């Protein structure tokens, strides 16, 4: 009984440390986002995070909570969230079976958070690592949109 109570307390203490995709954004799984990006010929924004990532939580609270960032990223990208430690299985548009952890490894997301802007076929365009501020995300969006010929609003 003591063991059950200890596990319950540990779980409740750890919950606030769990980082997830920012609320209010239409984040998809990586495989679904790849399919949608190809169908819409729209670039991807992939957020590599993990449970227990305090820097992910800080970025979520301090940068992704901004309404202008939310509007720009929702408008300009297909959004994907990848838990870089998860064993969740995905099926890529190519038919390849891969876990979220393997996606993280493929895109060198060994620390978190990592934010990777990609072409619709998954080729990296730009990468941000670590805590991001509103200004960082705004400037990255501007640079990616400029590189893509200004498809999204600046």
Located regions from the model:
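Positively charged n-region of N-terminal signal peptides that target proteins for export
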Residues: 1-4
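Thiol-based oxidoreductase modules, predominantly thioredoxin-like and allied folds used
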Residues: 24-27, 69-98
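A short beta-strand-turn-helix
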Residues: 26-44
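Short active-site neighborhood of thiol/selenol oxidoreductases, capturing the structured segment around
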Residues: 40-54
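The canonical Cys-X-X-Cys-His
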Residues: 53-57, 115
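Typically the conserved alpha-helix immediately C-terminal to a functionally engaged Cys/Sec
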Residues: 57-72
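Non-catalytic, surface beta->alpha helical segment in thiol-disulfide oxidoreductase systems
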Residues: 62, 106-150
């Amino acid at each position: 009984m003591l063991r059950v109570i200890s596990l319950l307390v540990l779980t409740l203490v750890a919950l606030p440390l769990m980082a997830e995709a920012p609320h209010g954004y239409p984040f998809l799984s990586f495989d679904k986002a790849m399919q949608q990006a190809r169908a819409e010929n729209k670039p991807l924004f992939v957020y590599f995070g993990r449970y227990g990532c305090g820097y992910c939580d800080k970025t979520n609270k301090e940068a992704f909570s901004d309404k202008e960032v939310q509007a720009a990223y929702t408008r300009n990208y297909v959004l994907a969230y990848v838990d870089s430690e998860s064993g969740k299985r995905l099926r890529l548009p190519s038919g390849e079976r891969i876990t979220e952890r393997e996606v993280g490894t493929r895109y060198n997301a060994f620390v978190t958070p990592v934010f990777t802007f990609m072409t619709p076929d998954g080729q990296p365009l730009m990468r941000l690592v670590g805590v991001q501020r509103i200004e960082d995300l705004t400037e990255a969006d501007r640079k990616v949109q400029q590189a893509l010929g200004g498809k999204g609003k600046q």
